[in-house]
Every structure is written in structure tokens, then in C-alpha cells.
């Protein structure tokens, strides 16, 4: 999905949520951008959102007398504005929203408020809960800061969010994400309750714990993320986006 997102940003010369969903659908149905030529290990929330997206395409095509076969290439700006791209049910807060986030802050890092907002939207179109939106906004902000040359200690500052509130506009972070921003992950790891679970709050906390405790070793951090168990590959993928920046 990260490759689909990156491809969309480049092809569209910017953020186009509809085009992103089209490419995610191609991945799901045809293996687009997959190393194996097929989709594998898609999360429940993502799958349901893509099925809903295709259902809405069908309805939209009939309403506006557009051949369904043309819907994936829809480019009319007025029609695109009428299409509701938020295809997730409310309350969906899986870790998949964070897994492929990095292309957004990479593309927009020179404009932090834009990067942060689009980071949130990129997750919310498939994972509709506020926690998913805010987890993506916060993590996107950290990646932006890393790309702008911030030191690790600055990224892990318990007051990072407070010091960069202008990046988040007037939308305050969800209280669970704000707790993470204040360092809730800074504890002894698995024995202290850190888990790489499917809930996005747990996943974000686990990835940041691995980053905080990796002694500046990517290998150590990735192994620590995996060794937390549960959804190991996703935790490591989230960790790697920030650690690799």
C-alpha cells in the first residue's frame, strides 16, 4: 500500500484520495505493486473499505451516467468533489492505517501543516476512527521533523506535540494519542504492557517504544518490534518508517 500511495502522489503531482483508493483496489484485486503479483495479508478494515469504495463507484457511475469501466480513471474535478472517499465505518482503528504512511510526509515535508493533515486523511479513508486519523497525524509529524533534520532526542521529546501545535491546526489530538506524545511508551517493554497489537494505539506505542529503546541501531529496534509478538510485521513496518527517516 505504501508503494500504491507513493505512486499516486507522483502520478497526480499531489494528494488525491480517490486515486489512492483506486490503486489500493488494484492491489487488492489484481496484485498491483505487489512483489509477488498478488495481494496478501490485507487487514479486515482495509478490505471492507475497498469493497465499500467499489460499491460507491457502482452507485456513482449509475447516478452520473458514467460507464463503470471508466470510474478508475475518473479525473473530472467537479465529479471527484462529489465522491465521498471516506469509505470506512466509524470506529475502525486498525494498525493498517499507519503501515504505509511514509510517502505522505516524504512528499510534503517542506510544508509541515499540509503533511500532517494529509497524513491523517491518508489513514482515515480506510480506517474511519478518530484515533486512526490522529495516530497518522502525529506519526506523520515525527517523520516530517526527522526529514527536516531533528535529532532523535527532539523527536522523542515529551513536549514535541505542544511545541509543534501549529502543525496540527486547531484539531487537538485524541487523548490516547496525546498520551503517547507525552511519552507513555517510555517503559520496560513487553513486561510493562507494550504490545504490537492490531489496535492502532497499541501499534503506535509499540513502534515508538522500539525506536526509543533501540540504542540507535535499526537492527536492534526492528528485532525488538518483532519480538513484541502479535502483529509483528506491522509493528516493524511502522517502526521502520521513522527509524529509517
Positions of the model-derived regions?
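Structured, active/binding-site neighborhoods that engage oxygen-rich ligands
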Residues: 1-245
Amino acid at each position: 500500500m505504501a508503494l500504491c500511495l507513493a505512486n499516486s502522489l507522483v502520478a497526480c503531482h499531489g494528494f488525491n484520495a480517490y486515486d489512492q483508493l483506486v490503486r489500493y483496489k488494484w492491489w487488492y484485486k489484481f496484485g498491483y505493486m505487489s512483489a509477488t503479483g498478488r495481494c496478501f495479508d490485507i487487514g479486515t478494515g482495509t478490505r471492507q473499505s475497498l469493497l465499500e469504495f467499489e460499491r460507491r463507484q457502482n452507485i456513482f457511475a449509475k447516478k452520473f451516467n458514467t460507464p463503470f469501466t471508466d470510474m478508475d480513471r475518473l479525473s473530472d474535478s467537479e465529479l471527484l468533489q462529489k465522491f465521498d472517499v471516506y469509505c470506512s465505518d466509524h470506529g475502525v482503528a486498525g494498525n493498517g492505517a499507519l503501515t504505509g504512511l511514509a510517502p505522505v510526509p516524504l512528499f510534503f515535508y517542506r510544508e509541515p501543516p499540509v503533511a500532517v493533515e494529509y497524513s491523517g486523511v491518508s489513514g482515515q479513508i480506510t480506517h474511519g476512527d478518530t484515533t486512526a486519523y490522529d495516530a497518522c497525524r502525529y506519526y506523520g509529524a515525527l517523520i516530517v521533523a526527522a526529514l527536516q533534520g531533528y535529532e532523535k532526542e527532539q523527536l522523542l521529546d515529551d513536549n514535541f506535540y505542544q511545541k509543534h501545535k501549529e502543525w496540527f491546526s486547531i484539531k487537538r489530538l485524541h487523548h490516547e494519542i496525546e498520551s503517547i506524545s507525552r511519552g507513555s511508551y517510555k517503559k520496560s517493554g513487553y513486561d510493562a504492557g507494550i504490545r504490537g497489537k492490531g489496535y492502532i494505539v497499541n501499534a503506535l506505542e509499540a513502534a515508538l517504544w522500539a525506536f526509543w529503546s533501540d540504542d540507535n541501531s535499526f537492527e536492534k529496534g526492528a528485532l525488538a518490534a518483532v519480538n513484541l509478538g502479535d502483529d509483528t510485521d506491522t509493528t516493524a513496518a511502522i517502526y521502520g518508517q521513522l527509524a529509517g527517516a
